[in-house]
Amino acid sequence: MITYLFPGQGSQKQGMGSSLFDEFKDLTEQADETLGYSMKRLCLENPYSNLHKTQFTQPALYVVNVLSYLKKIQDNDIKPDYVAGHSLGEYNALFAAGAFDFITGLQLVRKRGELMSMATDGKMAAVMGLTAAQVSDALQTHGLHTIDIANMNSPHQVVISGRKEDIERAKSVFEGLKDVTMFHPLNVSGAFHSRYMSEAKQEFEKFLQSFHFSAISIPVISNVHARPYEQDGIHSVLADQIDHSVRWNDSIRYLLDKGRMEFEEVGPGHVLTGLIHRIKNETEASPAM
């Protein structure tokens, strides 16, 4: 069996999609018309460093991931048995599964990016070396009750999310714990996947009400539940995803439990491929996890 994985925010880089925009000219022009700016110029020239601003990053990654997927299908004609995406990448997984067409997905991620970009007083950081339970215990022990766990990327890679000043306080706490191998602040504009996204979630819920989703043809593993989407739950899960944790480790463990599974990352970079290796290695090293 094979699972296609689609990366999310953080995988963007100048030059991504360079070989795809001319090959898929019609879709690129549709994206430009929908967004009101040139996707090719954004990705190749990165004017005003817009590629790293959430409201531009999310549409750009969605488009490049879609074109990468279409190129892959065009070249090898192999449909995956499962699809999954990390945060924003989940929209590409749903596109691949037929839940919506290219432009519908683009309209969704444009709105999502706009809403998330408005929450600018937060920060995120990756904690390496501790499990999610250990991170949660440390937050409680040191009175950091205003910080949430945003991503559970692997057994020992956890991302926390909160107000800027609280993440700064957490830095000294985690760097003082002997099992922490790294505390790495992320270059993001807000406290994504946390309680601080509740307003964005509420607005996105309203926006989603005008959309109808088609039948899913490939199982899509949800970040929120680490299980396949149910057809009647797409609206609620997409809204919940904004302020809920990304259960990436659990999602990959679920897929690994299906038997012999190959994973292929579709889109720019190799972040998810690296996480797959970490999940496999750390799970083998810690069977009780």
Swiss-Prot record:
Alphabetical list of Pfam families matching this protein: Acyl_transf_1
E.C. number: 2.3.1.39
Family to which this protein belongs: Belongs to the FabD family.
Listed GO CC annotations: cytosol
Catalyzed reactions per annotation: holo-[ACP] + malonyl-CoA = malonyl-[ACP] + CoA
Gene Ontology biological process terms, A to Z: antibiotic biosynthetic process; fatty acid biosynthetic process
Function summary: Involved in some intermediate steps for the synthesis of the antibiotic polyketide bacillaene which is involved in secondary metabolism. It catalyzes the transfer of the malonyl-CoA group to the acyl-carrier-protein AcpK (Mal-AcpK).
UniProtKB keywords: Acyltransferase, Antibiotic biosynthesis, Cytoplasm, Transferase
Pathway, per record: Antibiotic biosynthesis; bacillaene biosynthesis
SMART domains tied to this protein: PKS_AT (SM00827)
Positions annotated as active site in the UniProt record: 87, 193
Subcellular compartments: Cytoplasm
One MF annotation (Gene Ontology) recorded for this entry: [acyl-carrier-protein] S-malonyltransferase activity
Protein name from the UniProt record: Polyketide biosynthesis malonyl CoA-acyl carrier protein transacylase BaeC
